[in-house]
Protein backbone atom coordinates (compact mmCIF):
# COMPACT_ATOMS: atom_id res chain seq x y z
CA UNK A 1 0.00 0.00 0.00
CA UNK A 2 1.29 3.45 -0.92
CA UNK A 3 1.77 5.75 2.05
CA UNK A 4 2.24 9.41 1.05
CA UNK A 5 5.23 11.26 2.45
CA UNK A 6 5.14 14.41 4.56
CA UNK A 7 6.19 16.32 1.43
CA UNK A 8 3.30 14.91 -0.62
CA UNK A 9 0.73 15.62 2.10
CA UNK A 10 1.93 19.21 2.57
CA UNK A 11 2.09 19.78 -1.19
CA UNK A 12 -1.54 18.70 -1.63
CA UNK A 13 -2.71 20.97 1.19
CA UNK A 14 -0.72 23.97 -0.09
CA UNK A 15 -1.92 23.41 -3.64
CA UNK A 16 -5.55 23.10 -2.58
CA UNK A 17 -5.41 26.17 -0.35
CA UNK A 18 -3.75 28.32 -3.04
CA UNK A 19 -6.21 27.24 -5.73
CA UNK A 20 -9.11 27.93 -3.33
CA UNK A 21 -7.84 31.52 -3.02
CA UNK A 22 -7.65 31.67 -6.83
CA UNK A 23 -11.16 30.27 -7.19
CA UNK A 24 -12.48 32.82 -4.67
CA UNK A 25 -10.97 35.64 -6.76
CA UNK A 26 -8.41 36.82 -4.18
CA UNK A 27 -5.36 35.84 -6.25
CA UNK A 28 -4.39 34.61 -9.71
CA UNK A 29 -2.05 31.62 -9.97
CA UNK A 30 0.60 32.43 -12.59
CA UNK A 31 3.00 29.46 -12.37
CA UNK A 32 3.29 26.05 -10.79
CA UNK A 33 6.03 23.41 -10.80
CA UNK A 34 6.54 20.03 -9.16
CA UNK A 35 10.12 18.89 -9.68
CA UNK A 36 12.16 15.81 -8.89
CA UNK A 37 15.92 16.41 -9.02
CA UNK A 38 17.49 13.07 -9.90
CA UNK A 39 21.02 14.32 -9.16
CA UNK A 40 20.24 15.11 -5.52
CA UNK A 41 17.13 12.92 -5.16
CA UNK A 42 15.13 15.87 -3.86
CA UNK A 43 11.66 17.20 -4.57
CA UNK A 44 10.50 20.79 -4.89
CA UNK A 45 7.00 22.16 -5.33
CA UNK A 46 6.48 25.82 -6.17
CA UNK A 47 3.34 27.80 -6.86
CA UNK A 48 3.47 31.49 -7.82
CA UNK A 49 0.59 33.94 -7.66
CA UNK A 50 -0.31 37.60 -7.55
CA UNK A 51 -3.26 39.67 -6.43
CA UNK A 52 -6.08 39.80 -8.97
CA UNK A 53 -5.13 43.33 -10.08
CA UNK A 54 -1.54 43.23 -8.83
CA UNK A 55 1.91 42.83 -10.33
CA UNK A 56 3.97 41.75 -7.30
CA UNK A 57 4.25 37.99 -7.05
CA UNK A 58 4.51 35.54 -4.18
CA UNK A 59 5.91 32.05 -4.65
CA UNK A 60 5.55 29.31 -2.05
CA UNK A 61 8.44 26.81 -2.29
CA UNK A 62 8.25 23.50 -0.49
CA UNK A 63 11.17 21.08 -0.71
CA UNK A 64 12.38 17.82 0.76
CA UNK A 65 15.83 16.29 0.36
CA UNK A 66 17.04 12.73 0.19
CA UNK A 67 17.70 12.44 3.93
CA UNK A 68 14.17 13.61 4.76
CA UNK A 69 12.50 11.33 2.22
CA UNK A 70 14.66 8.28 3.04
CA UNK A 71 14.46 8.82 6.79
CA UNK A 72 10.69 8.87 6.61
CA UNK A 73 10.22 5.96 4.18
CA UNK A 74 12.82 3.73 5.84
CA UNK A 75 11.69 4.77 9.33
CA UNK A 76 15.20 5.57 10.49
CA UNK A 77 15.59 5.86 14.22
CA UNK A 78 16.35 9.47 15.25
CA UNK A 79 15.26 10.75 11.83
CA UNK A 80 13.46 14.08 11.90
CA UNK A 81 11.90 14.20 8.44
CA UNK A 82 10.13 17.29 7.22
CA UNK A 83 10.15 19.94 4.53
CA UNK A 84 11.89 23.23 3.97
CA UNK A 85 9.53 26.16 3.34
CA UNK A 86 10.37 29.46 1.66
CA UNK A 87 8.16 32.22 0.38
CA UNK A 88 9.62 34.47 -2.30
CA UNK A 89 8.11 37.85 -3.15
CA UNK A 90 9.19 39.68 -6.31
CA UNK A 91 8.61 43.23 -7.50
CA UNK A 92 10.24 45.98 -9.54
CA UNK A 93 11.43 49.09 -7.67
CA UNK A 94 12.51 52.63 -8.39
CA UNK A 95 14.65 54.36 -5.78
CA UNK A 96 15.56 51.04 -4.15
CA UNK A 97 17.51 52.49 -1.22
CA UNK A 98 14.46 54.16 0.34
CA UNK A 99 12.00 51.52 -0.83
CA UNK A 100 13.99 48.61 0.63
CA UNK A 101 14.07 50.22 4.07
CA UNK A 102 10.28 50.58 4.00
CA UNK A 103 9.84 47.06 2.63
CA UNK A 104 12.04 45.67 5.42
CA UNK A 105 9.74 47.36 7.96
CA UNK A 106 6.67 45.91 6.23
CA UNK A 107 8.13 42.41 6.14
CA UNK A 108 9.07 42.48 9.83
CA UNK A 109 5.62 43.82 10.73
CA UNK A 110 3.83 41.01 8.88
CA UNK A 111 6.23 38.12 9.51
CA UNK A 112 7.66 39.02 12.95
CA UNK A 113 11.20 37.91 13.75
CA UNK A 114 10.69 34.16 13.26
CA UNK A 115 11.68 33.65 9.63
CA UNK A 116 14.82 35.11 8.12
CA UNK A 117 14.06 37.81 5.55
CA UNK A 118 16.56 38.68 2.81
CA UNK A 119 16.10 41.20 0.01
CA UNK A 120 18.22 40.75 -3.13
CA UNK A 121 18.34 43.48 -5.76
CA UNK A 122 19.28 43.00 -9.42
CA UNK A 123 19.31 45.14 -12.53
CA UNK A 124 20.42 44.87 -16.14
CA UNK A 125 23.95 45.80 -17.04
CA UNK A 126 24.04 49.13 -18.83
CA UNK A 127 21.08 50.52 -16.93
CA UNK A 128 21.71 53.02 -14.16
CA UNK A 129 20.29 50.85 -11.37
CA UNK A 130 17.53 53.34 -10.53
CA UNK A 131 15.04 50.64 -11.49
CA UNK A 132 15.72 47.13 -10.22
CA UNK A 133 14.14 43.81 -9.37
CA UNK A 134 13.70 43.04 -5.68
CA UNK A 135 13.43 39.41 -4.60
CA UNK A 136 12.46 39.01 -0.95
CA UNK A 137 12.99 35.54 0.52
CA UNK A 138 11.15 34.63 3.70
CA UNK A 139 12.86 31.44 4.92
CA UNK A 140 11.72 29.45 7.91
CA UNK A 141 14.61 28.21 10.00
CA UNK A 142 13.11 24.84 10.85
CA UNK A 143 11.48 22.04 8.92
CA UNK A 144 7.73 21.87 8.76
CA UNK A 145 5.67 18.72 8.93
CA UNK A 146 2.10 17.53 9.05
CA UNK A 147 1.74 19.12 12.49
CA UNK A 148 1.74 22.53 10.78
CA UNK A 149 -1.02 21.75 8.24
CA UNK A 150 -3.53 23.80 10.23
CA UNK A 151 -1.22 26.83 9.90
CA UNK A 152 -1.18 26.82 6.09
CA UNK A 153 -4.34 28.93 5.62
CA UNK A 154 -2.99 31.60 7.98
CA UNK A 155 0.41 31.53 6.27
CA UNK A 156 -1.25 32.11 2.89
CA UNK A 157 -3.28 34.97 4.37
CA UNK A 158 0.05 36.51 5.41
CA UNK A 159 1.30 36.22 1.83
CA UNK A 160 -1.82 37.94 0.48
CA UNK A 161 -1.49 40.70 3.10
CA UNK A 162 2.19 41.10 2.19
CA UNK A 163 1.34 41.39 -1.52
CA UNK A 164 -1.18 44.14 -0.71
CA UNK A 165 1.42 46.06 1.30
CA UNK A 166 4.16 45.62 -1.32
CA UNK A 167 2.03 46.57 -4.33
CA UNK A 168 2.41 50.37 -3.91
CA UNK A 169 6.20 49.95 -4.23
CA UNK A 170 5.98 47.99 -7.48
CA UNK A 171 6.80 50.05 -10.56
CA UNK A 172 6.55 47.24 -13.13
CA UNK A 173 4.23 48.11 -15.99
Name every feature range the model reports, one short phrase each.
Residues 42-46, 57-59, 82-88, 135-137:
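Broad gene-expression machinery/nucleic-acid interaction feature
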Residues 104-173:
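Glycine-rich, aromatic-bearing surface loops/beta-hairpins
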Residues 66-130:
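Short, internal acidic amphipathic alpha-helical interface segments
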Residues 16, 20-75:
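N-terminal interaction modules that seed assembly of large macromolecular complexes
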Residues 2, 6-10, 99-103, 151, ...:
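Short amphipathic alpha-helical segments
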Residues 1-5, 93, 142-145:
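Short, charged/polar micro-motifs that form catalytic or ligand-binding hotspots
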Residues 1-24:
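Short, extreme N-terminal leader segments that mark the start of a protein/domain
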Residues 23, 27, 96-100, 168, ...:
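Short, solvent-exposed secondary-structure capping/transition elements
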Amino acid sequence: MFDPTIYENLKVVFEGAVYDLDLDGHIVVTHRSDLIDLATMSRTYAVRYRLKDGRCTAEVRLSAGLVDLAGEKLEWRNALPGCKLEIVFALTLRNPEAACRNIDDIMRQVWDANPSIVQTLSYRYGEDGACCRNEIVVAFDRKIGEGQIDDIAELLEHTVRTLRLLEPYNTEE
